[in-house]
């Protein structure tokens, strides 16, 4: 096992002579990763374009075909790296409160409900909930707001309690900019692909019961009670996000269908920046078998095209969770004979790139299997989270306890990890406050 320098019982630093920045492991000795993970992180840490340090969470682990482990945060002042993030922009989770409790939710009703959910929340399906082509374009451009109007969504707080209000695309990006970065053909595919949970990536829909509360004052602010049932959902942007990502990364396409769809999309790519994309395609070929990471200068035309594709396709992650929630809403009504209250506490991505201010610098933060956990000051524009800090939830792993907490203090460059979830029928939720505070100490700039 490579040697690490212990900062405290839950923080360890790893850096070899060849590395430009260190890796900070947010973990104890018992949870340090395997050699392959260390090797990947060492290779990444050699890149001179990185900023400060690489943060690696307690569940950091390699995935086949990926150059960067899941459970990492990587930062650069100048560059965007498509191989740092998995090809699933805005894979994420949403936490849904309900008005269900033991008085109105029996074991028989749970069985009846899950039989219904198997039909309306599929893990595998060729066609999900079909939407109009223009709505697919509007989702990419404007986020979930037009979709919620189309669905006539009954879920409370769905827009305001989605991270970034359910839209990663900046206001200055036009529809034409999106068509210059993503082939229109992909939108014709994407309009059929919402409402599918997905079988890859440990995607799930869990029903959970709150069994313990550690801070009643905070729990009351979040409208959480002992005995209350909630849903936790994990899924991403689906095939649309994959196709848009594969256009800009040297990562090997895992299936023949991905290669075929990418070929069709790029062959009939009606972009005003075709020459720029040709340059990108040439770079991708050069980095196909390289140990180095392909990086786009963020201010270049290539970087702007990649970022637009990433952000626009990421909106399909918010949209997929919104459609699945609508399907859940209708299923609950059929089973219970009434409208069951669904109230979104938070929807948060864990695969995304975003410009943020850390250590007084504007930097590009790449989160791969990790979430942001901003304190009240950074959440100052939200009516509730400006008081509590950003909500964070760690899901169950095959019926182990799950945890919910919030970031009560400001921390520099200290995002939290997503655990390794699995499908489970009924789990138990505990409410913890500041349970991770020892894991997120500010770190000095390298």
Where are the regions that the model predicts?
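A short, polar/proline- and glycine-enriched secondary-structure boundary/capping micro-motif
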Residues: 93-96
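Domain-length cofactor-binding catalytic modules of enzymes
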Residues: 2-43, 49-56, 62-70, 74, ...
């Amino acid at each position: 096992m490579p040697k690490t320098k212990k900062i405290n019982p839950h923080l360890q630093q790893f850096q070899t002579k060849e590395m430009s920045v260190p890796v900070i492991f947010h973990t104890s000795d018992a949870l340090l990763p395997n050699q392959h993970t260390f090797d990947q992180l060492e290779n990444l840490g050699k890149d001179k374009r990185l900023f400060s340090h690489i943060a690696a969470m307690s569940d950091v682990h390699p995935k086949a075909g990926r150059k960067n482990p899941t459970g990492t945060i990587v930062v650069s002042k100048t560059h965007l790296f498509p191989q740092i993030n998995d090809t699933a922009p805005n894979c994420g989770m949403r936490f849904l409160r309900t008005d269900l409790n033991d008085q109105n939710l029996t074991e028989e009703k749970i069985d009846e409900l899950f039989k219904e959910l198997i039909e309306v929340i599929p893990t595998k399906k060729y066609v999900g909930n079909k939407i109009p082509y223009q709505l697919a374009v509007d989702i990419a451009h404007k986020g979930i707001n037009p979709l919620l109007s189309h669905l006539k969504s009954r879920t409370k707080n769905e827009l305001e309690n989605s991270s970034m209000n359910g839209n990663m695309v900046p206001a200055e990006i036009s529809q034409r900019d999106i068509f210059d970065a993503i082939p229109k053909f992909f939108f014709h595919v994407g309009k059929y692909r919402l409402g599918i949970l997905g079988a890859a990536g440990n995607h799930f829909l869990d029903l959970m019961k709150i069994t313990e509360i550690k801070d009643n004052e905070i729990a009351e602010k979040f409208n959480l009670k002992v005995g209350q049932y909630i849903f936790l959902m994990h899924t991403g942007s689906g095939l649309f996000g994959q196709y848009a990502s594969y256009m800009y990364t040297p990562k090997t396409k895992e299936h023949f269908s991905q290669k075929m769809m990418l070929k069709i999309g790029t062959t009939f790519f009606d972009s005003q920046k075709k020459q720029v994309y040709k340059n990108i395609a040439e770079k991708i070929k050069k980095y196909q078998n390289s140990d180095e990471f392909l990086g786009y200068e963020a201010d270049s035309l290539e970087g702007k095209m990649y970022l637009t594709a990433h952000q626009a396709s990421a909106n399909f992650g918010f949209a997929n969770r919104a459609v699945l929630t609508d399907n859940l809403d209708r299923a609950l009504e059929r089973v219970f004979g009434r409208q069951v209250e669904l109230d979104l506490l938070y929807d948060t991505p864990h695969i995304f790139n975003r410009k943020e201010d850390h250590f007084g610098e504007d930097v590009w933060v790449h989160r791969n299997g990790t979430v942001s956990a901003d304190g009240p000051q950074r959440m100052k524009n939200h009516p509730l989270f400006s008081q509590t800090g950003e909500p964070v939830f760690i899901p169950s792993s095959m019926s182990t306890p799950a945890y919910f907490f919030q970031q009560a203090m400001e921390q520099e460059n200290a995002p939290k990890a997503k655990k390794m979830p699995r499908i489970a029928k009924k789990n138990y939720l505990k409410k913890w406050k500041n349970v991770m505070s020892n894991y997120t100490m500010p770190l000095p700039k390298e």
